[in-house]
Each structure stands twice: as structure tokens, then as C-alpha cells.
Amino acid sequence: MMSFVALNEEIQECCKCRLCETRRNVLCGEGNLNAKLMLIAQAPGENEDREGKMFIGPSGKVLDDLLIMADINRKEIYMTNLIKCMLPNYRKPKQDEIEICSRYLNEEIELINPKTLIPLGYFASKYIFEKYALSLLSRTESHKVYGKLFWTKGRKILPLQHPAALLHNNPLKEEIIRNYCKMNMLLKDCKWYPVCPMRRFYEEGKLNQKWIELYCKGDWESCIRYQMEENGEYHPDWMLPDGSTDERLHR
């Protein structure tokens, strides 16, 4: 595995596809090299191409607002793009461009080794889903996976809408904000985890790790056990985070 400095030098010198002919700057990833969260956008915009920095245009302002609402500092995360050069006229990335540029993204993932990958928008989500052998719906239905946490091959994946979706009057504004706020949960375990039966069952080898990663150390606010615990409601030890029961845990 190459060093982060060596990787950025290679990215900045890249002339492997047609995009090198129209760009001003190549955008390397930036942020916390020990980040637990790694945001992956599609490609730089015009402002980013001119200044050589991530998320500084209108979408960047929206992202900053979303991070504030999620109580997350930019210094806590690492940000990068699937495509490192601006796409002319904001066109869609071509398959050969994705194939060439994704090698750099794969190196970044190995170097940063975040606990959670957060692809923003369709093309970034499509690539990450394919890389980790997950099924993604068609582009017209891709919104159904946004805000849903996945766990595969030892990595969490939380696809989100691109901040640009809020540049106009989007009827899904509140949903998008809620989805972004889920990032904060991924930085800390459920407060009930130390005494939760799920932890004991997992440590005893009786419970699949996915339950721990998706709920206890993931989207724990959606956990039925968490909700009932918060409300002081009775729930059996063998009830799973999604509200179903596993009688094998009752034995």
C-alpha cells in the first residue's frame, strides 16, 4: 500500500483519461486521516475545480449546514470524490472514467480505513455498492436506499443524497436532514449496549455480528429495543433489534 503523500502526488499528475484536458485542478481527498466517517461525492464542481478544494461552492455551504445539524465538525471526517476531475458541463461520469479513477478511491479507503463509507448521490453509491457486492436499485428508485445503513465485508455503508439536492426547494428536505443526522450516531455506540443482552449473546457466539454493527454500533435510534428501553417498556431478552424474537436465544 502506498503512502498518502505518494497517492496524492500520483492523483495530481494523472493524465489517464480525457478529463485531464478540461480540468484546472485535480482534487485529492482531504480531512482527518484517522476519520471514522468517509464521505464520497461524485466529482468536483466548478468552484472546487477553480480553487482545488473540496465542497466550497453552493453544495459545500449546504453540506456545512447539514454537518452542523448533525453536530459533526469537518475536522472529524474525510472527504473525497469518485472522480477526481470536474466533469465538463456537469455531465454524467463515463464508465471508463470511473474504472480509471476508482483505483485512487480504493487506495484512499485502504489508507483511511474508515468504519463507515458515506457515498453521496447515485454514482458514488452505485460504485460503492458494486465494490461491496450490494444490490442497488435503478437510478429512479435509488432514493429508497438513502439513509439506510448497510454492513458488509466488515464495513458500514450509509448512502445519502448529495447536498446539491437541497439547492432547490426539495420536498424531501426534512428526510434528507434526518438522514444526515444519522452520521452522528455512527460515532458512538448505543448507551444501552454495555448492559444489552445483544452484547452478551454476540460475545457468546449466539448472535450474528450484523445485529451489533447495524444497530448497537450503528443506527441505534431505529432499534426497537432501544426505543422500548427509553420508554420503560418491557421487552424480552431474546427480542432482536428489529422487534422480532429469536427463540433460540431463550433457551
Where are the predicted features?
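Cysteine-centered metal-binding/redox modules
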Residues: 185-251
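A polyanion-binding, active-site-adjacent surface
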Residues: 1-184
